[in-house]
Amino acid sequence: MPHNQPATLSTSQSVRLWPVLSILVLVVTALVGTGCQSDAAQSAGTSAAKSTTTTTASQTDAAGTVWLCRPGLAQNPCDGDMSTTTVTASGQRTVQADPVGGEKTYNCFYLYPTASNESTVNSDLTVQSTETADATAQAARFSRYCNVWAPMYKQVTVSGLGQANTTDPGAYTVAYDSVLADWTDFISNYDKGLPIVFIGHSQGSIMLIKLIQSQIDNTPALRKLVVVSIIAGGNVVVPTGQTVGGTFRNIPLCSATQRSGCVIAYSSFPSQPPADANFGIPGQGISLNTGQTATTGVQVACVNPAALGGGTADLETYWPVETPLPIPSMAPPAPAVTTPWLYYPRQYTATCESRDGASWLQVVPVGATGDTRPVVNEIAGPTWGYHFQDINLTLGDLVADVHHAESAFKG
């Protein structure tokens, strides 16, 4: 597959792909800004760490990198209270205490999805509440097993998506150059040779694909440091029926026998994606932002986080209470609890499916009698599937995968 700059989308592709995302993120931004949260969020107090909305000296290092998350950072959104209320299908509740973490000898490098709400095409590096909310929702629970590093980058903003995908594809180059500078700072000054876990979603996955292609895939010394890469909602591709090749030449997909040094990639849908889906089908949608234009001979990768070896498995679904990001996608409202996290066991199962040129993680409700827990829906329509919930639907599984990958890496 080509490793060139992102292809320019046609006007029709851009019109279909981005306006819904813009509207949704602007709604979420309004919720964050006005403090409009669910009853659960209002009852949870302030136990989860929150970042300020301005850049401070403690966040900016000598190289100019602004860290959304890093070890020792005051008000670190990736290292808060992880105590959790478990709510079963019958409504029974139990509270899990914040797990005590041991010494962390691995680093996690996290790139957040589209969140910036500036009016420019590319964001500045000021930390906003939307980026903080994403970091808490997606990356914080990994801090049990690794030191989470999350740089701010000059991502394409919500309002800039349409322009970036039609008349200004160079905006993605600006974003990637920013990520590359952050990575160079991290690997030169902070990693100190420790093993690395990569985590990305949506635009973060676009950037992570390009970073791994240019810096890791063909560099054995760095490749051997990678424990596992989680690339959700990004359309990693492989040759049809294969586990290596395509997006990455030397890095395989994870499997039952390959638990480290590999990639976990998927996009979640409740059923088969439509022919014009933005995810799960090669050569279209988000694939175009990484220059992956091939439509034949390849398939979008699907690795089930709950069953790396394949098959159907229950999902370990975790939702942050205080961030409003998942709230617009769930009904009825989440139950009021006193912990910053909710865990819904045995609510969904997942299976990787492949049919008619599409590959996807099919997420299906267990459907227990009397289950009144909030359910996810396709808030942006069938072409997006469960994209906005990709990480949280599988979060407990992904954290366990990282833990198992670290064990395999050691051994």
Question: What is the predicted function of each stretch?
Answer:
Residues 200-208:
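Gly/Ala-rich beta-loop-alpha elbow adjacent to hydrolase catalytic centers
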